[in-house]
Amino acid sequence: MFKHLRPVWAEIDLDKLVYNMQQIKNICKGREIIAVVKADAYGHGALDIAPILLENGATRLAVAVLNEAIELRRGGIDAPIMVLGFTPDSLIETSLKYNIEQTVYSYEIAKEISEVAVKSNRVAKIHIALDTGMGRIGFLPDKESIDKIYKLSKLPNIQIEGIFSHFASADEQDKTYTKLQFNKFLWVCNSLEERGIDIKIRHIANSAAIIDMPELHLEGVRPGIIMYGYYPSSEVNKGKLDLKPVMSLKTTIVHIKNMEKGKYISYGREFKTEKESIIATLPVGYADGYSRSLYDKGGKIILKEQLAPLVGRICMDQCMIDVSHIEDVKIGDEVILMGENKGIKMTAEEIGNLLGTINYEVTCMISKRVPRVYIRDGNIVGIRNYV
């Protein structure tokens, strides 16, 4: 399809991304949308995805680590960007240089940021992280933490921009624990307000809470997987939000051969033809993020609006499929590894179910040696080659 690329690519449909953002805007009713673009926008390509999100309702961006934020700044993104995770002391000055908002979950971290900010004559914008029941980073919801947060709020050159927490099980049908977390979060926010601490944005609603619990939206929400067209679990109310998967993973057939009955295919000789078969080779493997486990789990691809099974172990750079039941298969025919075609589906959802994992992991697995091809109105509007 693209003469200047290897015949494996991730196709990113920007029209579907815009559609998903419109759905999110409709359900969030004017809240600040903090678009989560960590892990290279869940594998979709943060540099190309972020501008579209900002044009279509996102007011802020969130990443996991500082280098992701710096990449966006160097790419011309000037919207507020927060780092959700840990940043080493040695990188605080760099963070301030790029005007990145840092997460703070101890007085000591805030003090270090303050000292660097004073020396560099900058104001450090921070977000206070609370551990309301996830067991990760964050101040615990107790009086001691209130005192520490109050104390750090008085540090020079520190500006508290927001306060946030993360739900452990908002994607489950039983919302009891989520409500417990939310109540702890509100208790801390209210306690800080009573101490005179002004916080601009409270944000705790993730993708699942955005869908199921509008009362938890507060000033800001943090959509992640739903922007990319997938639901956080099968237990959320899918009727509240219509989503379209944004990414497809595609390749082309590079070799076809007839194989007699009783011939082995791939490493370990695990697959043996039970009859005369037509076997096609695809130039994609686990180094591209196409999991080696898919063969053992009954993985299939889409070819000519039909499913074809993977045969033999998936190699690092190649895999094989049985196309005996499909007519007129030729070298160069397009194959959908992840996606759908006229109702035939093998999306990240189906692949995740086969692998016993989640759709998040499937899209994030697609490696950097797979070019991202951006489509709008059916036309290619951009290609990002990482290697």
Swiss-Prot record:
<feature type="active site" description="Proton acceptor; specific for L-alanine">
    <location>
        <position position="267"/>
    </location>
</feature>
<feature type="modified residue" description="N6-(pyridoxal phosphate)lysine">
    <location>
        <position position="38"/>
    </location>
</feature>
<comment type="similarity">
    <text>Belongs to the alanine racemase family.</text>
</comment>
<dbReference type="GO" id="GO:0030170">
    <property type="term" value="F:pyridoxal phosphate binding"/>
</dbReference>
<dbReference type="InterPro" id="IPR001608">
    <property type="entry name" value="Ala_racemase_N"/>
</dbReference>
<dbReference type="InterPro" id="IPR009006">
    <property type="entry name" value="Ala_racemase/Decarboxylase_C"/>
</dbReference>
<feature type="active site" description="Proton acceptor; specific for D-alanine">
    <location>
        <position position="38"/>
    </location>
</feature>
<dbReference type="GO" id="GO:0030632">
    <property type="term" value="P:D-alanine biosynthetic process"/>
</dbReference>
<dbReference type="InterPro" id="IPR011079">
    <property type="entry name" value="Ala_racemase_C"/>
</dbReference>
<dbReference type="GO" id="GO:0005829">
    <property type="term" value="C:cytosol"/>
</dbReference>
<dbReference type="InterPro" id="IPR029066">
    <property type="entry name" value="PLP-binding_barrel"/>
</dbReference>
<dbReference type="GO" id="GO:0009252">
    <property type="term" value="P:peptidoglycan biosynthetic process"/>
</dbReference>
<feature type="binding site">
    <location>
        <position position="136"/>
    </location>
    <ligand>
        <name>substrate</name>
    </ligand>
</feature>
<keyword id="KW-0663">Pyridoxal phosphate</keyword>
<dbReference type="InterPro" id="IPR020622">
    <property type="entry name" value="Ala_racemase_pyridoxalP-BS"/>
</dbReference>
<dbReference type="Pfam" id="PF00842">
    <property type="entry name" value="Ala_racemase_C"/>
</dbReference>
<dbReference type="GO" id="GO:0008784">
    <property type="term" value="F:alanine racemase activity"/>
</dbReference>
<keyword id="KW-0413">Isomerase</keyword>
<dbReference type="InterPro" id="IPR000821">
    <property type="entry name" value="Ala_racemase"/>
</dbReference>
<comment type="pathway">
    <text>Amino-acid biosynthesis; D-alanine biosynthesis; D-alanine from L-alanine: step 1/1.</text>
</comment>
<dbReference type="Pfam" id="PF01168">
    <property type="entry name" value="Ala_racemase_N"/>
</dbReference>
<protein>
    <recommendedName>
        <fullName>Alanine racemase</fullName>
        <ecNumber>5.1.1.1</ecNumber>
    </recommendedName>
</protein>
<comment type="function">
    <text>Catalyzes the interconversion of L-alanine and D-alanine. May also act on other amino acids.</text>
</comment>
<feature type="binding site">
    <location>
        <position position="316"/>
    </location>
    <ligand>
        <name>substrate</name>
    </ligand>
</feature>
